[in-house]
Amino acid sequence: YQVNLTRREYRSITGPLEPVVRALLETGQPRHGADLPLPGGRRIVSVSPESFLVRRGDQLLTRPIKGTRPSDVDPDELLNSAKDAAELHMIVDLLRNDLGRVAVPGEVRVREPRAIERHATVLQTVAEVEATLRPGIGFEDIMAATFPCGSVTGAPKIMAMHQIDQLEASPRGPYCGAIGWLSHEDFE
């Protein structure tokens, strides 16, 4: 059982945000980064290394991350962590179940059970789970089966979400959500 609790922190920035956003994106060098202006001068800036869900035709791929160390640590420290291995395995099982709700029976596969991924400032362990979609499954069906991603809630997902609601001081809002793009057939 795992609940991924978070703590909201607020910071005020005086002056233009562009240099701060640029520095954040350049330092983190995220695989998935975004700078979304909002009404009222607010913005969402995202520097996430995690790929929640990718669809290409009838294929779905999710790449959950569990286990993080500073980038200057020996990768074996992370690979030898039983705690991090157990957390990733638990989330992989949860995501296999989520994808199984929209997949062709027997067509959910763990492509990579656990690998080290190096980022600018951290090392992380990542898995890859893929599935072949059943015919007629659309975006809404996929999101209903998978969102929010188990790697940001914990497992079992519904119980973890209930605990998050009880224990966190405010709703997460865009934090731990998903930013991406959609086309007629594909999304990321």
Segments the model singles out, each with a brief description of its role:
Residues 1-188:
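Extended alpha-helical targeting/anchoring segments
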